[in-house]
């Protein structure tokens, strides 16, 4: 099952071809943060170490097919006798008659390939997280600016109310209502300021920094353009996902381990040759007149309490489980792509209607402001219109962030990552 039967819903004609997540977005300072995260992120470095351990395991498995050379030297001295020194060299080799060692190397190689793909998947996910975190900081800055503008309007309303009161056109109750709105907005400003600091700390952790103030964050306040990635053939898009590749290599490794488990039941052939010598001094024992021996040995397991059969069952179940893990990974991949495509459509529609509502709210705010000055509406009506206008403005920002973040998710679902 590789995704050939998957049918994607149509996507926007504005989608663009890209080969990496960084191709989707271009903004000041972002690439530097991505490079820093790939170099210093603690979680990614742990995944890299796991990959290196898997690569070392290949050498360990391959070493079983090499000659083993052992050297020994000993000396003894007993009462009423001369000292005796013995030296020896032994060369041994296991004949890989059944390709058991070869299968072990194959399994280790596929394990390393799976670890390499898992590392690549971690790199892709990290880049996506850095981009989303960067966009989140910009979002919180914009929301803070909206609240600050809301506060400015409310404070201006307080001044207007005082002027009207002094001329006998209003009451102090109106002023209390305006001050209530101002105080509530100040609380929101404090919240957004804290949210910005928290978002910067989140990005700093991704970058692997101890100093989490992120004082070098660019003075960017506008969203960058984030392209919608172009969906090609489903099997091509899903095939480049590293998590699917990792799951596939895990299957191949488990299949090789099943072969190793079965071949453990077969006889093994070992060849060894040795040289030994002894003497009353160390120099005399260093092969001045050595004896040699040659040994061929065949061993076969007869009874081990069912351990070997249990190992076979375990290997087969592990292999079966890896197939189900691959299927689960594939189905999740299909769902992620389809969800992102549906979200793109929904966000586009929501933005369209929210923009209409925002324009209407601006017109209403202007109308109600004039009517309030004429005494046709009270302050509660005016503040309600202002609230609606600013809330819609904030909603537009949040929708835009959600759409841009969703495009990053779509790129990640399609296997876009970062260049090597």
Region spans (language model):
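Small/polar (Gly/Ser/Thr/Ala-rich) solvent-exposed segments
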Residues: 45, 65-84, 92-121, 245, ...
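Periplasmic alpha-helical coiled-coil/stalk elements that build and connect Gram-negative outer-membrane
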Residues: 101, 117-233, 343, 347, ...
């Amino acid at each position: 099952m590789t995704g050939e039967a998957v049918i994607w819903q149509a996507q926007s004609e504005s989608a663009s071809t890209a080969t990496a997540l960084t191709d989707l977005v271009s903004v000041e300072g972002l690439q530097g943060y991505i490079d820093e995260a790939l170099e210093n992120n603690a979680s990614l470095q742990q995944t890299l170490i796991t990959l290196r351990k898997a690569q070392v395991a290949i050498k360990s498995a391959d070493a079983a097919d090499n000659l083993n050379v052992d050297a020994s030297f000993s000396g003894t001295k007993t009462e009423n006798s001369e000292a005796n020194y013995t030296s020896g060299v032994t060369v041994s080799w296991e004949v890989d008659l059944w390709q058991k060692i070869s299968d072990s190397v194959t399994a280790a190689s596929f394990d390393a390939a799976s670890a390499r793909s898992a590392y690549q998947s971690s790199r892709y996910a990290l880049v996506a997280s850095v981009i989303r975190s960067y966009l989140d900081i910009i979002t919180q800055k914009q929301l803070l600016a909206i609240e600050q503008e809301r506060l400015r309007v409310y404070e201006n309303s307080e001044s207007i109310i005082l002027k009207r009161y002094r001329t006998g056109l209003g009451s102090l109750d109106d002023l209390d209502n305006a001050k209530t709105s101002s105080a509530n907005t100040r609380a929101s400003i404090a919240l957004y300021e804290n949210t910005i600091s928290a978002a910067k700390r989140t990005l700093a952790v991704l970058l692997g920094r101890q100093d989490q103030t992120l004082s070098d964050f660019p003075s960017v306040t506008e969203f960058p353009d984030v392209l919608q990635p172009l969906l090609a053939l489903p099997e091509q898009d899903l095939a480049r996902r590293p998590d699917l590749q990792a799951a596939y290599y895990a299957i191949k490794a488990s299949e090789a381990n099943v072969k190793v488990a079965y071949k453990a039941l077969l006889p093994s052939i070992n060849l060894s040759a040795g040289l030994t010598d002894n003497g009353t001094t160390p120099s005399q024992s260093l092969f001045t007149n050595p004896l040699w021996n040659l040994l061929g040995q065949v061993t076969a397991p007869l009874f081990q309490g069912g351990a070997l059969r249990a190992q076979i069952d375990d290997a087969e179940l592990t292999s079966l489980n890896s197939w189900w893990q691959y299927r689960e990974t594939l189905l999740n991949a299909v769902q992620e792509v389809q969800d992102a495509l549906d979200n793109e459509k929904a966000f586009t529609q929501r933005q369209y209607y929210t923009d209409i509502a925002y324009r209407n709210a601006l017109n209403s705010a202007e109308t109600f402001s004039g009517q309030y000055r004429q005494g046709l509406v009270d302050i509660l009506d005016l503040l309600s219109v202002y609230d609606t206008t600013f809330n819609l403005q904030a909603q537009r920002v949040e929708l835009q962030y959600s759409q841009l973040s969703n495009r990053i998710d779509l790129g990640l679902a399609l296997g876009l990552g970062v260049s090597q």
